[in-house]
Design a protein with these regions (language model features):
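Phosphate/adenylate-binding glycine loop and adjacent helical scaffold
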Residues: 1-139, 172, 245
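Hydrophobic, aromatic-lined core segments that form the binding pocket/scaffold
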Residues: 110-123, 127-147, 155-215
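Short helix-adjacent coil turns
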Residues: 146-152, 235-242
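Accessory, usually C-terminal, subdomains that scaffold auxiliary metal cofactors
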Residues: 184-185, 190-238, 244-254
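Acidic, carboxylate-rich catalytic segments that either coordinate divalent cations
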Residues: 228, 240-294, 309, 316
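Cationic, low-complexity basic patches in intrinsically disordered or flexible, solvent-exposed regions
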Residues: 304
Length: 316
Protein backbone atom coordinates (compact mmCIF):
# COMPACT_ATOMS: atom_id res chain seq x y z
CA UNK A 1 0.00 0.00 0.00
CA UNK A 2 1.24 3.50 -0.86
CA UNK A 3 1.86 5.53 2.31
CA UNK A 4 3.73 8.59 1.06
CA UNK A 5 4.05 10.30 -2.33
CA UNK A 6 6.71 12.80 -3.42
CA UNK A 7 7.83 14.26 -6.73
CA UNK A 8 10.52 11.65 -7.41
CA UNK A 9 9.51 8.74 -5.22
CA UNK A 10 6.68 7.09 -3.37
CA UNK A 11 6.77 4.79 -0.35
CA UNK A 12 5.18 1.38 -0.12
CA UNK A 13 4.34 -0.49 3.08
CA UNK A 14 4.79 -4.23 2.56
CA UNK A 15 3.21 -7.02 4.59
CA UNK A 16 6.25 -7.39 6.86
CA UNK A 17 5.95 -3.76 7.97
CA UNK A 18 9.00 -2.77 5.94
CA UNK A 19 8.90 0.41 3.86
CA UNK A 20 10.28 0.33 0.31
CA UNK A 21 10.85 3.57 -1.61
CA UNK A 22 10.24 3.48 -5.36
CA UNK A 23 12.34 6.13 -7.10
CA UNK A 24 12.63 7.82 -10.44
CA UNK A 25 15.95 6.59 -11.83
CA UNK A 26 17.98 9.51 -10.48
CA UNK A 27 20.89 7.81 -8.78
CA UNK A 28 19.53 7.55 -5.24
CA UNK A 29 21.18 4.70 -3.38
CA UNK A 30 19.13 4.54 -0.20
CA UNK A 31 18.83 1.11 1.42
CA UNK A 32 15.38 -0.39 0.81
CA UNK A 33 14.85 1.43 -2.50
CA UNK A 34 14.27 0.40 -6.10
CA UNK A 35 14.27 2.40 -9.33
CA UNK A 36 11.77 2.68 -12.15
CA UNK A 37 12.38 3.36 -15.82
CA UNK A 38 11.16 6.95 -15.51
CA UNK A 39 13.66 9.77 -16.02
CA UNK A 40 14.03 13.29 -14.59
CA UNK A 41 11.50 14.64 -17.08
CA UNK A 42 8.88 12.05 -16.21
CA UNK A 43 5.50 12.88 -14.74
CA UNK A 44 5.77 13.62 -10.98
CA UNK A 45 4.64 10.66 -8.93
CA UNK A 46 2.22 12.75 -6.90
CA UNK A 47 0.20 13.41 -10.09
CA UNK A 48 -0.46 9.72 -10.72
CA UNK A 49 0.03 7.75 -7.46
CA UNK A 50 -2.12 8.31 -4.40
CA UNK A 51 -2.15 7.47 -0.70
CA UNK A 52 -3.68 4.06 -0.04
CA UNK A 53 -3.20 2.73 -3.59
CA UNK A 54 -2.35 -0.94 -3.99
CA UNK A 55 1.01 -1.68 -5.60
CA UNK A 56 2.23 -4.80 -7.33
CA UNK A 57 4.80 -6.07 -9.80
CA UNK A 58 3.97 -8.62 -12.48
CA UNK A 59 6.00 -9.40 -15.58
CA UNK A 60 8.53 -6.69 -14.76
CA UNK A 61 5.88 -3.95 -14.69
CA UNK A 62 5.10 -1.94 -11.56
CA UNK A 63 1.46 -0.92 -11.31
CA UNK A 64 -0.38 1.35 -8.90
CA UNK A 65 -3.90 2.53 -9.64
CA UNK A 66 -3.87 3.80 -13.23
CA UNK A 67 -0.07 4.14 -13.28
CA UNK A 68 2.34 1.56 -14.66
CA UNK A 69 6.02 1.55 -15.57
CA UNK A 70 8.69 -0.95 -16.53
CA UNK A 71 11.27 -1.59 -13.83
CA UNK A 72 14.83 -0.69 -14.79
CA UNK A 73 16.13 -2.74 -11.87
CA UNK A 74 13.83 -5.11 -10.02
CA UNK A 75 16.20 -5.44 -7.07
CA UNK A 76 16.72 -3.38 -3.98
CA UNK A 77 19.85 -1.27 -3.88
CA UNK A 78 22.91 -3.15 -2.65
CA UNK A 79 23.37 -3.00 1.11
CA UNK A 80 26.23 -3.91 3.42
CA UNK A 81 26.84 -4.60 7.09
CA UNK A 82 30.45 -4.77 8.20
CA UNK A 83 32.50 -4.20 11.36
CA UNK A 84 36.27 -3.60 11.56
CA UNK A 85 36.93 -3.29 15.31
CA UNK A 86 40.72 -3.49 15.00
CA UNK A 87 41.21 -0.50 12.68
CA UNK A 88 44.57 1.20 13.28
CA UNK A 89 44.08 4.37 15.35
CA UNK A 90 46.88 6.30 13.62
CA UNK A 91 45.54 5.45 10.17
CA UNK A 92 42.05 6.47 11.25
CA UNK A 93 43.25 9.87 12.48
CA UNK A 94 45.23 10.45 9.29
CA UNK A 95 42.37 9.40 7.04
CA UNK A 96 39.76 11.48 8.83
CA UNK A 97 41.89 14.60 8.27
CA UNK A 98 42.10 13.76 4.56
CA UNK A 99 38.39 12.99 4.52
CA UNK A 100 37.57 16.33 6.17
CA UNK A 101 39.69 18.21 3.63
CA UNK A 102 38.07 16.49 0.65
CA UNK A 103 34.56 16.85 2.09
CA UNK A 104 35.10 20.57 2.59
CA UNK A 105 36.08 20.85 -1.06
CA UNK A 106 33.52 18.56 -2.69
CA UNK A 107 30.49 18.56 -0.34
CA UNK A 108 27.25 20.16 -1.54
CA UNK A 109 26.27 23.41 0.17
CA UNK A 110 22.63 22.43 0.52
CA UNK A 111 20.64 21.49 3.61
CA UNK A 112 23.05 21.31 6.52
CA UNK A 113 25.83 21.12 3.95
CA UNK A 114 25.70 24.91 3.97
CA UNK A 115 27.25 24.65 7.44
CA UNK A 116 29.94 22.19 6.43
CA UNK A 117 32.86 24.45 7.40
CA UNK A 118 31.27 25.20 10.78
CA UNK A 119 30.76 21.49 11.42
CA UNK A 120 34.38 20.70 10.63
CA UNK A 121 35.57 23.52 12.90
CA UNK A 122 33.39 22.15 15.69
CA UNK A 123 34.79 18.63 15.28
CA UNK A 124 38.45 19.59 15.01
CA UNK A 125 38.72 22.94 16.81
CA UNK A 126 35.77 22.67 19.25
CA UNK A 127 34.30 25.94 17.98
CA UNK A 128 30.63 25.77 18.97
CA UNK A 129 28.14 26.64 16.18
CA UNK A 130 26.20 29.90 16.61
CA UNK A 131 22.74 29.63 18.24
CA UNK A 132 21.14 30.81 14.99
CA UNK A 133 22.05 27.46 13.39
CA UNK A 134 19.59 25.42 15.42
CA UNK A 135 20.00 22.07 13.67
CA UNK A 136 23.78 22.27 13.72
CA UNK A 137 23.73 23.22 17.41
CA UNK A 138 21.47 20.26 18.16
CA UNK A 139 23.81 17.93 16.29
CA UNK A 140 26.78 19.33 18.22
CA UNK A 141 24.87 18.70 21.46
CA UNK A 142 24.19 15.10 20.42
CA UNK A 143 27.86 14.59 19.49
CA UNK A 144 28.97 15.74 22.94
CA UNK A 145 26.25 13.64 24.56
CA UNK A 146 27.49 10.49 22.80
CA UNK A 147 31.03 11.30 23.86
CA UNK A 148 29.93 11.78 27.47
CA UNK A 149 28.36 8.32 27.59
CA UNK A 150 25.45 9.60 29.71
CA UNK A 151 22.22 7.92 28.65
CA UNK A 152 19.84 10.71 29.67
CA UNK A 153 21.96 13.33 27.90
CA UNK A 154 21.95 11.19 24.76
CA UNK A 155 18.16 10.86 24.93
CA UNK A 156 17.89 14.64 25.28
CA UNK A 157 20.14 14.96 22.24
CA UNK A 158 17.96 12.60 20.21
CA UNK A 159 14.85 14.56 21.19
CA UNK A 160 16.49 17.70 19.83
CA UNK A 161 17.76 16.18 16.59
CA UNK A 162 15.61 13.32 15.28
CA UNK A 163 13.36 14.68 12.54
CA UNK A 164 15.03 18.11 12.43
CA UNK A 165 15.03 19.46 8.90
CA UNK A 166 12.89 18.92 5.83
CA UNK A 167 12.62 16.38 3.03
CA UNK A 168 12.19 12.65 2.64
CA UNK A 169 15.03 12.14 5.12
CA UNK A 170 15.51 15.25 7.31
CA UNK A 171 19.02 16.70 7.47
CA UNK A 172 19.70 15.84 11.11
CA UNK A 173 18.61 12.24 10.54
CA UNK A 174 21.08 11.90 7.66
CA UNK A 175 23.92 13.13 9.88
CA UNK A 176 22.91 10.69 12.64
CA UNK A 177 22.87 7.84 10.12
CA UNK A 178 26.40 8.76 9.08
CA UNK A 179 27.54 8.72 12.71
CA UNK A 180 26.03 5.26 13.10
CA UNK A 181 27.85 3.95 10.04
CA UNK A 182 31.24 4.95 11.45
CA UNK A 183 30.52 3.81 15.01
CA UNK A 184 29.26 0.41 13.91
CA UNK A 185 31.97 -0.23 11.35
CA UNK A 186 34.78 0.61 13.78
CA UNK A 187 33.26 -1.36 16.65
CA UNK A 188 32.26 1.62 18.78
CA UNK A 189 29.20 3.09 20.44
CA UNK A 190 27.26 -0.12 20.86
CA UNK A 191 25.18 1.35 23.71
CA UNK A 192 24.36 4.46 21.67
CA UNK A 193 23.32 2.36 18.66
CA UNK A 194 21.09 0.22 20.86
CA UNK A 195 19.59 3.31 22.49
CA UNK A 196 18.92 4.89 19.08
CA UNK A 197 17.10 1.77 17.86
CA UNK A 198 14.92 1.74 20.97
CA UNK A 199 14.22 5.47 20.71
CA UNK A 200 13.21 5.31 17.05
CA UNK A 201 11.03 2.25 17.68
CA UNK A 202 9.20 4.08 20.46
CA UNK A 203 9.00 7.62 19.09
CA UNK A 204 10.26 7.65 15.49
CA UNK A 205 6.92 7.75 13.71
CA UNK A 206 5.86 10.80 15.67
CA UNK A 207 9.11 12.71 15.20
CA UNK A 208 10.31 12.05 11.65
CA UNK A 209 9.21 10.61 8.32
CA UNK A 210 8.47 6.90 8.05
CA UNK A 211 11.31 6.40 5.57
CA UNK A 212 13.78 8.28 7.75
CA UNK A 213 12.75 6.31 10.85
CA UNK A 214 13.50 3.12 8.95
CA UNK A 215 16.86 4.48 7.75
CA UNK A 216 17.82 5.34 11.33
CA UNK A 217 17.00 1.81 12.49
CA UNK A 218 18.92 0.26 9.60
CA UNK A 219 21.93 2.51 10.23
CA UNK A 220 21.94 1.72 13.94
CA UNK A 221 22.04 -1.94 12.94
CA UNK A 222 25.08 -1.39 10.75
CA UNK A 223 23.28 -1.39 7.39
CA UNK A 224 24.59 1.07 4.81
CA UNK A 225 24.28 1.65 1.08
CA UNK A 226 27.09 0.72 -1.27
CA UNK A 227 28.57 4.24 -1.82
CA UNK A 228 28.84 4.86 1.94
CA UNK A 229 30.31 1.39 2.47
CA UNK A 230 32.98 2.05 -0.16
CA UNK A 231 33.81 5.36 1.51
CA UNK A 232 34.15 3.66 4.89
CA UNK A 233 36.48 1.12 3.29
CA UNK A 234 38.69 3.96 2.03
CA UNK A 235 38.96 5.37 5.54
CA UNK A 236 39.68 2.01 7.16
CA UNK A 237 42.13 0.75 4.55
CA UNK A 238 44.29 3.87 4.26
CA UNK A 239 43.26 4.48 0.64
CA UNK A 240 45.24 7.13 -1.29
CA UNK A 241 43.80 10.61 -1.81
CA UNK A 242 42.68 10.05 -5.41
CA UNK A 243 40.75 6.93 -4.47
CA UNK A 244 39.06 8.61 -1.52
CA UNK A 245 38.19 11.64 -3.64
CA UNK A 246 36.46 9.54 -6.28
CA UNK A 247 34.60 7.53 -3.66
CA UNK A 248 33.57 10.64 -1.71
CA UNK A 249 32.27 12.36 -4.83
CA UNK A 250 30.01 9.38 -5.52
CA UNK A 251 28.71 9.44 -1.95
CA UNK A 252 27.88 13.17 -1.91
CA UNK A 253 25.83 12.82 -5.10
CA UNK A 254 23.20 10.91 -3.15
CA UNK A 255 20.04 13.00 -3.02
CA UNK A 256 19.85 16.77 -2.91
CA UNK A 257 21.85 17.14 0.30
CA UNK A 258 21.64 13.73 1.99
CA UNK A 259 24.98 12.49 0.65
CA UNK A 260 26.87 15.43 2.10
CA UNK A 261 24.99 15.17 5.39
CA UNK A 262 25.72 11.44 5.63
CA UNK A 263 29.40 12.24 5.10
CA UNK A 264 29.24 14.91 7.82
CA UNK A 265 27.95 12.21 10.14
CA UNK A 266 30.61 9.71 9.06
CA UNK A 267 33.28 12.30 9.85
CA UNK A 268 31.75 12.94 13.28
CA UNK A 269 31.58 9.21 13.97
CA UNK A 270 35.23 8.80 13.04
CA UNK A 271 36.12 11.64 15.42
CA UNK A 272 34.22 9.91 18.22
CA UNK A 273 36.06 6.66 17.58
CA UNK A 274 39.54 8.15 17.28
CA UNK A 275 39.61 10.50 20.28
CA UNK A 276 40.90 9.23 23.59
CA UNK A 277 37.78 10.46 25.38
CA UNK A 278 35.62 8.50 22.99
CA UNK A 279 37.63 5.33 23.55
CA UNK A 280 36.90 5.63 27.28
CA UNK A 281 33.17 6.20 26.92
CA UNK A 282 31.65 5.04 23.66
CA UNK A 283 33.80 2.15 22.40
CA UNK A 284 32.52 -1.32 23.12
CA UNK A 285 32.78 -4.74 21.48
CA UNK A 286 31.98 -4.73 17.78
CA UNK A 287 28.66 -5.99 16.52
CA UNK A 288 28.55 -9.73 16.00
CA UNK A 289 27.26 -9.55 12.44
CA UNK A 290 29.78 -8.77 9.75
CA UNK A 291 30.05 -9.08 5.98
CA UNK A 292 27.75 -8.19 3.13
CA UNK A 293 24.16 -7.68 4.23
CA UNK A 294 21.85 -9.68 2.00
CA UNK A 295 18.90 -7.33 2.18
CA UNK A 296 17.51 -8.69 -1.07
CA UNK A 297 17.16 -12.16 0.45
CA UNK A 298 15.81 -10.90 3.76
CA UNK A 299 13.22 -8.50 2.39
CA UNK A 300 12.49 -9.59 -1.16
CA UNK A 301 11.75 -13.30 -1.00
CA UNK A 302 14.37 -14.63 -3.41
CA UNK A 303 14.87 -11.22 -5.02
CA UNK A 304 11.27 -10.73 -6.13
CA UNK A 305 10.43 -7.19 -5.13
CA UNK A 306 7.16 -5.89 -3.65
CA UNK A 307 4.91 -8.89 -3.44
CA UNK A 308 2.17 -6.64 -2.19
CA UNK A 309 -1.15 -8.08 -3.36
CA UNK A 310 -1.71 -11.47 -1.71
CA UNK A 311 -5.26 -11.58 -3.09
CA UNK A 312 -3.97 -11.44 -6.66
CA UNK A 313 -2.56 -14.74 -7.90
CA UNK A 314 -0.52 -12.92 -10.55
CA UNK A 315 1.62 -11.51 -7.77
CA UNK A 316 2.41 -14.86 -6.19
Amino acid sequence: MVIGVYRKCFNVLVDSGTIVSVFVNTGYTMPMSIHTSLNEGGEPFFDCVFEGDDVWISGGVLTSGGFACIMSDALLQEMHRCAIPEADADILKKQQLLFASLLKKHGKRRGEGKNLERWIKFLFEEIVPPPSEKILCSLAYLFEAIRSGDEQTVIAGLERTVGAGIGLTPSADDVICGMCHALYMFGAGREFLSLLRSYVKAFGRGRTTLVSAQQLKLSAGGVMSDPVFRLMECIAQNAPEDTMRRTLCKAVEYGSSSGTELCMGVLAGCCLVSTEAARQTVCFAAGKESGNYDGQKEFCDKKQVLRLCPSDEACR
